Amino acid sequence: LSHPDRGNSGVFAVGAYEVQISDTFGLDPEPRAWREQALLKKPNTWGGSVYGLRAADVNMCLPPLSWQSFDLKFTAARFDGEQKISNARITVWQNGVLIHEDFELPLGTGGGPSGPRAEVARGPITFQNHHNPVQFRNIWLVER
């Protein structure tokens, strides 16, 4: 069993940093437990994770077919010309619970052989369609 078989998507800030949206309801993030459950993916790729960089502080995924909510507070990396002078930062709430607090993003997230995505100061907010049906609603963007 791998969690993408139960749903897999994500939201990308500036096209470079992914917060994973996937069905990991009821999975235990303790390493001993996920090995026993025959999971193929580690918790830093589970729902609510900053993909490949950091697992959520708590698995806040609701049961399948429940609407999930995410609130993201994101500050892009800063650059002086081509030189990065400060890392991006993100705070994430899932279903009303803080799961990442002011996490510093040392590099873009990425999966597969291409590795981390390039970091940029500005870019789109994108949503991933990754093999499973997914729906989004009530999307808000507030510039700060």
PLM region descriptions:
Residues L1-R144:
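Carbohydrate-interacting regions of secretory-pathway proteins
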